[in-house]
UniProtKB/Swiss-Prot annotation:
Species this chain originates from: Aspergillus fumigatus (strain ATCC MYA-4609 / CBS 101355 / FGSC A1100 / Af293) (Neosartorya fumigata)
Protein name, UniProt field: Probable aspartic-type endopeptidase AFUA_3G01220
Spans annotated as Disordered: 31-50
GO cellular component, one term: fungal-type vacuole
Glycosylation-annotated residues: 103, 149, 178, 187, 253, 256, 276, 308, 361, 394
Family: Belongs to the peptidase A1 family.
Organism taxonomic ancestry: Eukaryota, Fungi, Dikarya, Ascomycota, Pezizomycotina
Length: 439
């Protein structure tokens, strides 16, 4: 891949995994306020213990390939266990895992911001997501396609229709199929796509959502009424196969083909933890109209630590989405300005690039995120990220902290910059998240 300085923001969102998608660069002066709401889900179990182990562990690995990001921050551009090998889309942009559907095995993207499990069907129609014109199947860059057999049972009178924030669209049929993930087999409702406008990666054949069932994209054909069903994670815990919890840890030092972390179903990942867990309620943040409603796992934070002082203006009831699909942390703009001004030499925001450009040899100030009474410090390595090459062939770097806009006008995210430093526990049953510093 070749990056000009003008393509930095594309690199942030998709890194080595992007296709020819063309994101609109964030312009601070031209934001449209988002319509959002926040709710706290009801707990239905007691919190799991901080030592809960499980055999259902998915190993994350990294590859260099192309495929766009379906992350929370994509909305800011105003367009949009057992053991299995997982694929990480470069610098924490996304993850994929191996899953058995019927008698076939596929790689699917893991997405904490959606609920559906879907794969593309053989013979599907590929369209350009922008022009909506039919193109060759190879343009969608899917992995192997699903061929339904006798174990797949289509639900008559229902269909699936999905639109992502970056303009991708898919539609197809709904049905049930035997699905095995990390050694656990369930009969699961899935979407089978006949029509796709997709920025693929050449590896994955679909996507697996881990969010709440309210995000399911199934509808009745007669009056287009939403039809809710359990995502695969909920199916597993409602059948008593796992506890209602999943967790994630990322490894910044992973190279291509090596372990980049773990996603664990029903417990904690098999890694060492520094100190104790800090707890905070899960807040479901709903973002309307881009082009559908999006619900994300979100939390409140206590503030941001910078050097020997704290920045309480980062808190005050502001919701931060926990999103492994976003490379950077996105703070309210005044907070991001303060953190980036503390680099030596300072990082400078470039409006065209939508990023703070920083000297690749700069020194980052001590910086941490304060949650649940604890401060989780960011490794300096995660504060300066490669930005490709400029038009003159010079190496460029960008800050791990970006501007998310003014409060009420943007989306704030704790992404890979934060998540590479913690073990993150999504305790859905107790309606809380827990974080501990990773060793």
């Amino acid at each position: 891949m070749h990056f000009s300085i003008g393509s930095l923001f594309l690199y942030l969102i998709a890194s080595a995994s992007c296709t020819a998608a063309s994101p609109q660069y964030i312009q601070r002066s031209r934001r449209t306020p988002f319509t959002t709401s926040t709710s706290k889900p009801s707990a239905f179990t007691n919190p799991s213990t901080d030592t809960a182990t499980t055999p259902y562990v998915l190993e994350l690995t990294k590859i260099n390939n192309k495929g766009n990001a379906r992350s929370a921050v994509e909305l800011n551009s105003q367009v949009r266990s057992g053991s299995a090998n997982l694929v990480s889309f470069a610098e924490g942009v996304g993850f994929a895992t191996s899953i058995n559907i019927g008698n076939q095995t596929f790689e699917v993207v893991i997405d904490t911001g959606s609920s559906d499990l879907w794969v593309v069907r053989d013979g599907f129609i590929c369209i350009d997501p922008v022009s909506r014109k039919e193109v060759a199947q190879s343009e969608c860059r899917f992995g192997p396609a699903y061929a339904p057999n006798t174990t797949f049972h289509e639900v008559v009178g229902e269909f699936v229709d999905i639109k992502y924030a970056d303009g991708e669209i898919l539609s197809g049929v709904i049905g049930t199929e035997n699905v095995t993930l990390a050694g656990i087999t369930v009969n699961q409702t899935i979407g089978v796509m006949d029509y796709a406008g997709w920025y693929g990666d050449g590896v994955t054949s679909g996507l697996m959502g881990l969010a709440y069932s309210s995000l399911a994209s199934a509808y009745t054909t007669n009056n287009r009424q939403p039809r809710l069903y359990n995502p695969i994670f909920a199916t597993m815990y409602e059948q008593g196969l796992i506890d209602p919890i999943f967790s994630m840890v990322m490894n910044r030092n992973a190279s291509n083909g090596t372990a980049a972390g773990y996603l664990t179903l029903g417990g904690l990942p098999p890694v060492d933890i520094n100190g104790n867990f800090s707890t905070t309620p899960i807040l479901i943040t709903n973002i309307k109209g881009y082009p559908k409603d999006y619900d994300f796992y979100a939390v409140n934070i206590d503030g941001v630590a910078l050097g020997n002082r704290s920045l309480p203006e980062a808190a005050g009831g502001i919701q931060y989405i926990i999103d492994s699909g976003t490379t950077l942390n996105y703070y309210p703009t005044p907070v991001a300005d303060s953190v980036n001004a503390a680099f030596i030499p300072p990082a400078v925001y470039n409006d065209y690039d939508g990023a703070y450009v920083v000297d690749c040899n700069a020194t980052a100030s001590v910086h941490g995120v304060m949650i649940g009474g604890s401060t989780f410090y960011i490794n300096p390595t995660d504060m300066i990220l490669p930005g490709g090459m400029d038009n003159s062939g010079n190496k460029t770097c960008i800050s791990g902290i970006n501007a998310g806009g003014d409060v009420g006008q943007g989306i704030f995210v704790l992404g890979g910059t934060f998540l590479r430093n913690v073990v993150a526990v999504f305790d859905v049953g107790a309606a809380e998240m827990r974080f501990a510093a990773s060793a």
